[in-house]
Amino acid sequence: MHDANIRVAIAGAGGRMGRQLIQAALGLEGVQLGAALEREGSSLLGSDAGELAGAGKTGVTVQSSLDAVKDDFDVFIDFTRPEGTLNHLAFCRQHGKGMVIGTTGFDDAGKQAIGEAAKDIAIVFAANFSVGVNVMLKLLEKAAKVMGDYTDIEIIEAHHRHKVDAPSGTALAMGEAIAHALDKDLKDCAVYSREGHTGERVPGTIGFATVRAGDIVGEHTAMFADIGERLEITHKASSRMTFANGAVRSALWLKGKDKGLFDMKDVLNLNYL
C-alpha cells in the first residue's frame, strides 16, 4: 500500500450504497477515490464517479474491468452480491489488494473462502459498518450474560422492500453475539419462522422476525422478555451514509496491514470493553 493516502475502489458504484461510498471516500481525509466499478453493459460506464454520486467531477471514470484499474487502488470496498464479491475476492487475493466486505447473504462456503483469502490479504468483513450497531453488539453480549438464561430472546429486523436476503446479516450477527455469550451455537438454537400450530415456545431458543417494507434503511431490536418485564435494545439507521462512512473508515484502518481477517470490533477497538 502507498505511504500517502489509501486509494480505494468502489464496487457497484451506480447503486444506492455505491454512490454513498463514493461520497464517503471523497469526504474522509487520508482516503483517495482510485476507481469505481459497475457491471459490464451498464449505461453508467464512462461516467465520472463523483458526478454520479452528486459530489462533483473527480476525473475517476466508472469502469467494468478490475484489470483495467488494478494499479489505481489499494483497498477494494464491496457491498454487492455474494457471487460478485467472491469473484472480486479472488482478484484481490491474486494482486495483493486489501478488501472491505459489507456484502451479506454468504453461505458457509463463501465465508470459508473469505477466511482463506485473509491468510494472504487484509480483510475487514462485517455484517454492519455502523458504529452504533457495533456498540449494540457489545451491549447484547453484556445483556445476554446477565439475562439470557432467564428470558425469551427475540430479534426483530426491518428493511426496505428491495433487500434480497433474510434475516439480515446484522440480525444474524446479533444472534451470534448473544449465542456466543451464552456458550451456544446459533445453528442449534435459532428459530427463523413460526407458522400454524407451533406449540409453546421452546426455552433457550433465539427467535427471528423479518419485515420488508417501503424505504426502511435498517432497524434492529433484540428483546429479552421475562414475566413482568422486557428489555429491548434497538438501533435505527436513517441514512446509508452511516454504513458508508464506517466502511471507508475501515479501509483507512487497513493501511499498513498485510493480511488477516478483521471486523468492526477491531476497527473501533471494542474488544477491550
Curated annotation (Swiss-Prot):
Alphabetized PANTHER family for the sequence: 4-HYDROXY-TETRAHYDRODIPICOLINATE REDUCTASE 1, CHLOROPLASTIC-RELATED, DIHYDRODIPICOLINATE REDUCTASE
Pfam families (alphabetical): DapB_C, DapB_N
Subunit relationships: Homotetramer.
InterPro entries hit by this protein: DapB_C, DapB_N, DapB_N_CS, DHDPR_bac, NAD(P)-bd_dom_sf
Main location: cytoplasm
Encoding gene, per UniProt annotation: dapB
The organism of origin for this protein: Escherichia fergusonii (strain ATCC 35469 / DSM 13698 / CCUG 18766 / IAM 14443 / JCM 21226 / LMG 7866 / NBRC 102419 / NCTC 12128 / CDC 0568-73)
Locations listed in the record: Cytoplasm
Matching CDD domains: DHDPR_N (cd02274)
Protein's name in the database: 4-hydroxy-tetrahydrodipicolinate reductase
Binding site for NAD(+): 12-17, 38, 102-104, 126-129
Biological process, per Gene Ontology: diaminopimelate biosynthetic process; lysine biosynthetic process via diaminopimelate
Biological role: Catalyzes the conversion of 4-hydroxy-tetrahydrodipicolinate (HTPA) to tetrahydrodipicolinate.
GO cellular component terms, semicolon-separated: cytosol
Reaction(s) this enzyme catalyzes, per UniProt: (S)-2,3,4,5-tetrahydrodipicolinate + NAD(+) + H2O = (2S,4S)-4-hydroxy-2,3,4,5-tetrahydrodipicolinate + NADH + H(+); (S)-2,3,4,5-tetrahydrodipicolinate + NADP(+) + H2O = (2S,4S)-4-hydroxy-2,3,4,5-tetrahydrodipicolinate + NADPH + H(+)
Example of a GO MF term: NADP binding
Matches recorded under SUPFAM superfamilies: Glyceraldehyde-3-phosphate dehydrogenase-like, C-terminal domain, NAD(P)-binding Rossmann-fold domains
Active site location: 159, 163
